[in-house]
UniProtKB/Swiss-Prot annotation:
CDD domains: PseudoU_synth_EcTruB, PUA_TruB_bacterial. The keyword Iron-sulfur does not apply. The keyword tRNA processing applies. It comes from the Bacteria. Responsible for synthesis of pseudouridine from uracil-55 in the psi GC loop of transfer RNAs. Gene3D superfamilies: Pseudouridine synthase, PUA domain. Keywords: Isomerase, tRNA processing. InterPro entries: PsdUridine_synth_cat_dom_sf, PsdUridine_synth_N, PUA-like_sf, PUA_sf, tRNA_psdUridine_synth_TruB, tRNA_sdUridine_synth_fam1_C, TruB_C. SUPFAM superfamilies: Pseudouridine synthase, PUA domain-like. This is tRNA pseudouridine synthase B.
Length: 315
């Protein structure tokens, strides 16, 4: 007999506005506890220094978190010029100070260098692993290990303002882009050094900025529900985004109850207009209930890749 999961079977995505000073895992565990969720996972860590958009997947939505991890991101970053640190942010030790002396044209030429497709060497102060251990652990021990440059793409790099020694930029980039590394490299190109003093993630995939909620807002709703002796889900669940928003960029294939039954049992089915070599979003019937994602197999049939478990909601 299957063991009953601890917590509530709740599915959806919380678009959390993470505060500074907390780890992404700490934020994840807080949200999981507030929702009393049986399962939860985030979609790519934000540095403790950083604030902003951190999608938290609950329940069956965790099956599609990789799609958000792979999605484009957008950041607002403020760099302090003239000072370089060992971590490329304000948490690190100052390693060099230099005068600031560049023209507006030199700044624009430096920014242009980072636009488009480039190769980036990850910072030693990152969570990437080398021989099973995060790079930042080697860095804290004063060790430097080899890192391979990785391809990244900066879709947009917009100048926002320059006030004194503080430069603010808006960056729309591909997954795996280290904003601290861009900031450090930019500082070196300008000949003065730089480090991040403010970093805010303003976008993940196509999620709307105004749908974010803070931990304080969630905890206030939980407290209100308890005070009014109401089920917390009445106040908390309306804030959840549907789990299929994680794969909203995929082509939709709508199937009948009969075909859905075959798919849910792991069997491929024949459908029309199935794209080649692309994942698709599978919906059911006129209500277009999301049932998962699939892909064309070698026989030209729609094969299930990752399906949701449809269950009755628990209190």
């Amino acid at each position: 007999m299957a063991r009953k999961p601890r917590g509530r079977l709740v599915d959806g995505i919380v678009l959390l506005d993470k505060d500074t000073g907390m780890s992404s895992n700490f934020a994840l565990q807080r949200v999981k506890r507030i929702y009393n969720a049986a399962k939860a996972g985030h979609t790519g860590a934000l540095d403790p220094l950083a604030t902003g958009m951190l999608p938290i997947c609950l329940g069956e939505a965790t099956k599609f978190s990789q799609h958000l991890l792979d999605a484009d991101k957008r950041y607002l970053v403020t760099a302090k010029l003239g000072v370089r640190t060992d971590t490329s942010d304000s948490d690190g030790e100052v390693v060099q100070t230099r005068p600031i002396n560049f023209t507006e044209q030199q700044l624009e030429e430096a920014l242009e260098h980072f636009r488009g497709e480039t190769m980036q060497v990850p910072s030693m102060y990152s969570a990437l692993k080398y021989q099973g251990q995060p790079l930042y652990k080697y860095a804290r021990e004063g060790k430097e290990v080899p890192r391979e440059a990785r391809p990244i793409k900066v879709f947009e790099l917009n100048f926002i303002k320059l006030e004194g020694d503080e430069l603010t930029l808006d960056i729309h980039c591909s997954k795996g882009t280290y904003i601290r590394t861009i900031t450090d490299d930019l500082g070196e190109m300008l000949g003065c050094g730089a480090h991040v003093i403010m970093l805010r993630r303003t976008g993940v995939a196509g999620y709307p900025y105004d749908k974010m909620v803070t931990l304080e807002q969630l905890e206030a709703l939980l407290a209100k529900a308890q005070e009014e002796e109401r089920p917390p889900k009445e106040l908390l669940d309306p804030l959840l985004l549907p789990m299929d928003t994680a794969v909203s960029g995929l082509k939709e294939i709508n199937v009948s109850d009969e075909l859905a039954h075959y798919l849910m049992n792991g069997n491929p089915v024949q459908v029309a207009n199935l794209p080649i070599d692309e994942l698709v979003r599978i919906t059911l019937g006129e209500a277009k209930q999301f049932v998962g994602i699939g892909q064309m197999n070698d026989d030209g049939l729609l094969a299930p890749k990752r399906l949701v478990v449809l269950h009755d909601e628990q209190a």
